[in-house]
Amino acid sequence: MFYRFCRSLFRFFFGVFCGWEVFGAENLPQKGPVLVIANHFSYWDPVVVGSALGRQVHFMAKSNLFSYPVLGFLISKLGAFPVDRRRIDRTSLKRALSLLDEGKVVCIFPEGTRSKTGTLLPPLPGAAFLVRKAGVSVCPVALQRKKRIFGNNLFPCYHVHVGATFSVNKPGRRDLQADADLMMAKIKELLEDSI
């Protein structure tokens, strides 16, 4: 209920003040576990992805965000869970796998951090590890910054492109980085197709 209320509120905000557009939202399966992957260039990205999709999305969020009482409470209520990016966070990975096992949608930003220039960064292998362990399909989301409101980067405007789901669980594949690169290539392909 709280998640749906917040999603409606942000959809209204992005629609009225940002002129955002969402393409291909129907590509996200309406049932079953899915790992959503997206490029990352703004603090707004999780809010935008969560607002664009028709199901509740659980995000890995950097652990220090939970140290702020109000923010930590809000993002926890919205289904986010902490990840320590300085190390392999087994607790966070187990939480993501548990959510996927329950048939939920989990989103991860394969780059592991925001790209300050907006260009795609090399992916880390975490998303590929989750897919391999959970055996779930992947839904790529490409975020495009279209313009800025109020002449600054506080409220970036987006085009959101949701691609068709795909699988990376090929028999005999053992290279996580190769799978991570494949996943990032899907995001890049969406961005290139939208130009």
Kindly give the residue locations of the regions a language model identified:
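Catalytic core of membrane glycerolipid acyltransferases/transacylases, capturing the structured
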Residues: 2, 6, 15, 28-87, ...
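A short beta-turn/loop motif at secondary-structure boundaries
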Residues: 26-28, 153
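Short gly/ser/thr-rich secondary-structure transition/capping motifs
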Residues: 15-23, 87, 142-144
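Short, Lys/Arg-enriched, disordered terminal segments
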Residues: 1-4, 193-195
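Secondary-structure boundary/capping positions in well-ordered alpha/beta enzyme cores
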Residues: 20, 55-56, 81, 103, ...
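Residues at the C-termini of beta-strands that transition into short coil/loop
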Residues: 26, 63, 84, 142, ...
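Non-catalytic C-terminal accessory region of glycerolipid acyltransferases
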Residues: 91-195
